[in-house]
A protein has these predicted regions:
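Positively charged n-region of N-terminal signal peptides that target proteins for export
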Residues: 1-4
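Bacterial N-terminal signal peptides
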Residues: 6-15
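Sec/Tat signal peptide C-region and signal peptidase I cleavage site
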Residues: 16-20
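Catalytic-domain carbohydrate-binding cleft regions of carbohydrate-active enzymes
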Residues: 21-420, 425, 437-439
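Solvent-exposed beta-hairpin/edge-strand motifs
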Residues: 432-444
Length: 444
């Protein structure tokens, strides 16, 4: 009576073996394909060229690809560029918004501009993110979750801390490939995928994206040996791979997008994922559960042109720092005037001034690597913001001063300390007098 049962089990086992042989092999290696069209706001051209040509090319070409290829996902950074799209190309901008809602056009980078992250103050860097996120919430009903800087000249140890405290989870770039000297051995990176720890111990995930101008010509990427080799460089058996174009915007080539689409449907050993710039980071949350992730605790600096960038165009560095200091001082005075009920808070004016000069913290602008023509626009905007901040500061301090009891013998002088702590320093005051006095007494 047992024989039929044994035979039946044998038949089932054979059937299962045959089914396993005919099934697709399990794909253990993953490739996150991140499409981008990096656009330098100013470099070998000025901002007018960017708006008239490169922003339009980026918008129109990617709308075409999104309509033609159902698996295509495009990533683009910089709130100021989206604002230009809205202002100059409103019809196409509405189409873009529809693709954002469907998850096909991804808002990357979180910030108002893809800025340098070494020269700006921490206040500027955080405000850059806040201004970007505010724009994205208002326009698209969403926020970004990553720092997306494919082309930037070094990354300070503060960046993971800033990102973490702004609610961001990951950071990607490809610029460290440009280094002359390795971090250790022959590697120019601490790792391809892992955790980057900031100065306060905060961690975000770090991904090296490789060359953002990478192209393929209508191949099945699930069989691509180069990509498969890159997955073996991480303990995750995974690669995070930029593809597209750089500097002048535009879009990935049709052959590249077609290759990704074929790879998604392919039978090779690689799982091809048409990815947003933050998908990999989200897939590995919470990071505490991934002990296999290597950890880097330090700064990621460039040793090539990055060094010269921090001495070039000194006027830009000066104007930028003056705006950072004056903007902060103006806001403190405006808050005091508003709190005392003396004057309304000029939020719109202050935000406008911050946006105007933060846009010039772009990594080819503030760093001093753009053509002379570009700096005609940069200096103009820096000076406009200085004037605007100065107006707010003067009006706010003046309003507060008018409410103070200054009935004293002699000439009353009001000092405003914009810092958050007491200061002992030398102050200069110009006073009117009928003739040069023999002496001056100062009373507190």
């Amino acid at each position: 009576m047992k024989l039929p049962v044994i035979l039946l089990a044998s038949e089932l086992l054979c059937s299962g073996s045959m089914h396993a042989q005919s099934a697709k092999p399990e794909k253990k290696a993953k490739a996150y394909m991140v499409a981008d069209a990096h656009l330098d706001t100013q470099w070998n051209w000025d901002v007018q060229t960017t708006i008239k040509e490169y922003v339009w090319n980026t918008l129109s070409r990617n709308l075409f690809l999104l309509k033609k290829y159902p698996d295509y996902i495009f990533n683009f950074e910089g709130g100021v560029k989206y604002a230009w799209m809205k202002e100059y190309f409103p019809s196409e901008y509405e189409q873009l918004k529809a693709f954002v809602r469907s998850g096909r056009w991804h808002i990357s980078g979180s910030s108002w501009e893809a800025s340098d992250v070494l020269v700006p103050s921490v206040e500027s860097s955080i405000r850059n993110i806040l201004l970007g996120q505010e724009y994205y919430r208002k326009e698209f009903g969403t926020e970004s979750t990553d720092i997306f800087l494919p082309d930037c000249f070094g990354f300070g140890w503060t960046l993971p801390t800033i990102a973490k405290h702004c609610g961001l989870i990951g950071f990607s770039s490809q610029k460290l490939d440009w280094r002359n000297h390795p971090f250790y051995g022959e590697s120019k990176h601490p790792f391809m995928l892992g955790l980057w720890k900031g100065i306060d111990g905060s961690s975000i995930m770090l991904a090296h994206g490789y060359d953002y101008g990478k192209r393929w010509n209508n191949i099945d990427l699930s069989e691509d040996k180069e990509l498969l080799g890159l997955t073996k460089r991480t303990p995750l058996n995974t690669v995070y791979r930029y593809y597209g174009t750089g500097d002048t915007g535009g879009s990935p080539s049709i052959g590249s997008v077609s290759s990704v689409e074929k790879g998604i449907k392919g039978n090779g050993p690689l799982e091809i994922i048409s990815a947003t710039s933050d998908q990999l980071f989200k897939d590995y949350l919470p990071y505490e559960k991934h002990s296999e992730l290597p950890v880097f605790n330090g700064e990621l600096l460039m040793d090539v042109h990055g060094t010269g960038c921090y001495t070039s165009q000194a006027a830009m560095k000066l104007y930028n720092r003056q705006n950072e200091l004056l903007g902060d001082a103006a806001e403190r005075a405006a808050v005091a005037a508003d709190w005392l009920g003396i004057a309304g808070y000029p939020g719109e004016s202050l935000t406008e001034a911050w946006k105007r000069f933060i846009f010039h913290q772009f990594h080819d602008d503030l760093t001093g690597t753009s053509i002379p023509r570009a700096y005609e626009f940069s200096w103009n905007d820096e000076l406009l913001s200085l004037k605007q901040f100065s107006g707010v500061l003067t009006a706010s301090v003046g309003a507060v001063s008018e409410k103070m009891d200054t009935r004293v013998k002699g000439i009353p002088v009001v000092f405003y300390n914009a810092l958050g702590f007491p200061v002992t320093d030398v102050a200069e005051v110009a006073i009117e007098a009928p003739k040069f006095p023999k002496g001056v007494s100062v009373y507190n």
